[in-house]
Structures are given as structure tokens and as C-alpha cells.
UniProtKB/Swiss-Prot annotation:
This is Potassium-transporting ATPase potassium-binding subunit. HAMAP family: KdpA. One of its GO terms (cellular component) is plasma membrane. It comes from Laribacter hongkongensis (strain HLHK9). Coiled coil: none annotated. Its main location: membrane.
Amino acid sequence: MNHSAVAQTGLYLLVLLALAWPLGRYLAALLEGRLAQRFAWMGRIERGILWLMGAAPDEEMGWKRYAAAILLFNLAGVVLLFLLQRWQGMLPLNPAGLEGMSADSALNTAVSFVTNTNWQGYSGETTMSLLTQMLGLAVQNFLSAATGIAVVVALVRGFVRSGGGAIGNAWLDLLRATLWLLLPLSIVVALVLVWQGVVQNWYAGLTISSLESHTTQLLASGPVASQEAIKLLGTNGGGFFNANSAHPFENPTPFSNWVEMLSIFLVPAALVVMFGRMVGDLRQGVVLLAAMTVLFVGAFAVVYLAESQANPLLTALGAAGDSGNLEGKEVRFGVLASSLFATITTAASCGAVNAMHDSLMPLGGGMTMLLMQLGEVVFGGVGSGLYGMLLFAVLAVFMAGLMIGRTPEYLGKKIGAPEMKLVSVAILVGPLLVLAGTAIAVLTEAGRAGMANPGAHGFSEVLYAFSSAANNNGSAFAGLSANTPFYNLMLAVAMWFGRFAVIVPVLALAGSLAGKPRLAATAGTLPTHGPLFVVLLVLSVLLIGALTYIPALALGPVIDHLQLFSR
């Protein structure tokens, strides 16, 4: 990498950690209940809202009740969002007069936004009414992110608590995450984006006069900034416009691009700091942050180096410049900012894009795909990134214990066969959905019909789609025509089970750990707060990804790269 890439990446990480550290302390105080005790008015607001919901604020839940509450809450979200999309043509705040969506597309979109995936098989500005955007999609952007936070806090409590098996109150955790974290942050970020030029209005569109042809043109508009903020802070990723954050109404300036990149990683990084404070050892959080940072920097280096090369097909035509691969990228961002954004959005389960990933060089696109396939644990989604990395931490401790004869133990909790079964299920769900879904798609006529490109690149488009859906990312290789009944239903299944078939084992693990005593460290305990454990954790993540996905990646991005550079 050149000096500019190193400087920009280093500055980004420094600013991110500077913001995440105090936010992590705030999160620990908030979700442990210390803020509500200190500020009585916060407690009164929480109790009032929970009373309206019919929930008891002081009631502790076991993992089964906690999981049932999370599942029912999100299932209700799917039903309501599905109906809102189907009936939007009859509802107000629809100045463009848009009709309701088809049943399969509405189901796909409802599952997509409820699961924090935000996969979009439609063009937002020509499909969704303002009411659907605000009351449906934006609301689920908050609630899906709050769900991830609630689940990871429950898991952290499992490590902290001793005996009893209670892991908290799901309704209170959801409320606190939404009301005292996501909403205030979104207001601040939305105001910054409006200052930079992101639109925020209730118009059907803006009519302008063209300077060149002297004709009028209607530019789609709406409440973009408010949705853009939570789309990024909640690692949701679904854009108001089809071009997502490449659209100048969503991301007009290099500074707004910088703010958007910071917003994606801010809460995931802060949650890791929160974890260290809640378990009483900040070093444990620092180790996870270090492992995430190592994986992120390595991935960015691969993407940037790949995109710094000109496309050999354009070079042969004499059409390639000296700025690298600019196909599918906005000139106002260039190769460096586009590569950094692409790495961030696929490392987190965000999926927002400021460049077209289908136009990335094969190795660049392959790396963004691999980041998703690793389980979105490199900072990852809000909540899901941390609980995913904690699963790998437990796995790393268990493997180390088997190799050196030490008792598998993490944060004072013994790791036995029941815990490892739950960890294994949670880790293997994603690969099963990705590989099985891709296989079904390429073996059926309906699946192959959506592939716009033949050969390795067409296979990569399908593999990317299922990797994105099953790992709740939402970005796409847009050459795949995915708004069909086949892909809408297949990807909806991948998104739902990719989210909740992981959440349920994670909550079961939390309940199992919470019922165990927390033991003091002994000479036989593997230290999990030093550089050695960082290396072990990174290798565990890469080992699972390599063993699982290398054959599929070889058939897609690797062959695509070899074919491109052998011409």
C-alpha cells in the first residue's frame, strides 16, 4: 500500500477507537442499569414505556423466555412490514402514487430489514412510498440493531453471572438500546449529513431544468438523512436510493463519506469496549479489538492492492488510466475511499456501498465475499459481530485446551461438551445456508436464469448473494437479477435462518454459562488477554473460513482472476 492508504487507514482507526472508548463505557453503564439508577427520569421513562407494553421492568428471564421474546418480537415485525408494503398504495404519504409490492418481494424485504440484512431486490426511490420508508424500513433499522445489542448483552451476562441462569430482560434491553443509544446517535449523524448536503424532505421529487438539453427532470427525494444515519449506525445498509451511498443525495462529499464509514464501525467497536468493562477486565476487550483490527487491515490491503490495478481488458484497448480500476466507482471518492468503504461494509454486516461491488477486480470482490463468509466477525454487525467473535473465542480456547491438555475455560467459565455443541451449531449455520443455497441456485433453471454473466463471474454473483443473505450483510454483485420469486424466497429463508438459527444457540449458550460458577484463574488456565491469544483467535477465524469456503471461492473469484489476467 502507498503512504496515502496507510495514513488514511491509520487515521480512520485512531478516530474510531477514540470515539468507541467513551461510547463503550457509556454502553456498559446503560445496559448494566447504572444510568437508570443514577438518573431517576430515565428509569421513569423506561418503566412507563414497559408498562404500556405490558412488560415488567424488573423481571429476569431465562434463555428460553428471552429467546421467545426476541423471536416473537421480530416475527411481528415481519408481518407488519409485509402488510405495510402490500397496502402502501392505499395509505397516505405516497405522493408518487406507488402501488403495493408483490407478495414474494414484500416477504423478502420484510425478512431482510427485520434480520438486519437490508438486502434490496428493488429500487427504493421507485418502489417504496415515503410512509413505507419511514414507518417500515427506518423503524426496522432501529429495532433490528437493538435486537443484536440485546442478544450480545445477554451473552456477556452469561459470562459475568454465576448460578441461576437468568440473562436479563429482553424488553428492557431492546428499549434501552433503541431509546438511549441508537436514537440519540442517529439524530447527531443525521444533522451532520444534512449539513453536508444529504436531502431531508417529504417531496415526491425535485423538478430541475437541465443545462444541456434545456428540459426538465424529476429527481427522486424524501427523508433521506434520517434513514441514512440509522442505516449506517445500525449496520443495516439498505439505501433510500438504488445506488445506495454512491448516490450524491445519500453521500455527497468526501467528508460525508468519512462520517458514514465511521458510523458503520462505531457501535460494533464500542460494544467490544463494553464487553471488557462488563466482564471486569478491559484487556479481554482489547484482545478482541486487536484480532478484529488485524483481520480488517489485512483484508483492506488485499482489496486496495487489487483495485489499484487497471483492468487488463481496458489496458489492451488503451482505455485504462493510471488511477487503478475506476469502473463502478464515484470519481469524488476514487479507488482508495471506495476500497476502504467496501472493506468496512463487508467486514461489518452493513452492506451499504459507495461503489458497485460487481465491478471490483476478482480478488477484491473475492475478499469482500470472504469477509462475509467468515461470519461477519471483523467488527461485524451491531451486536452480531461481537457475539460471533465470542463464539470463535470459545472455540479457540477449546482447541487450545485439547492441544495442550489444559482445562477449556474462558472468563472463568468451564467450557464443556454442551457449550461446544451450541458453538458448533451457531458457527456452521452460515456455511450450510451459503453453500446449499448456492448449489440449489446453480442446479436449477430458475436460479441460473438470474445470472447475467456466464462462467466464474456468474457463479461468483450467486455465491455472493447467498453469502450476503445468510450472513445478514445485504450488499450484492448487482449483475444478478434477484427480484424473482425463486431468489426472493430462497434468500428470505437464508436471511431468516442465518439470523435466528444463530441467535437461539447464542442465547442457549448464555443461559448455560450463566448457570455455572465463575472460577478464579489458576496455573492451568489459558491466558486470554495477551498477544498469543490474539494470534490463536485470528487463526481460528481464518481456519474455519479456509476449510469451508476455499473450494467455492476457487470456482468463483480465483478462476475469474486467472481468466482475466491470462488474456
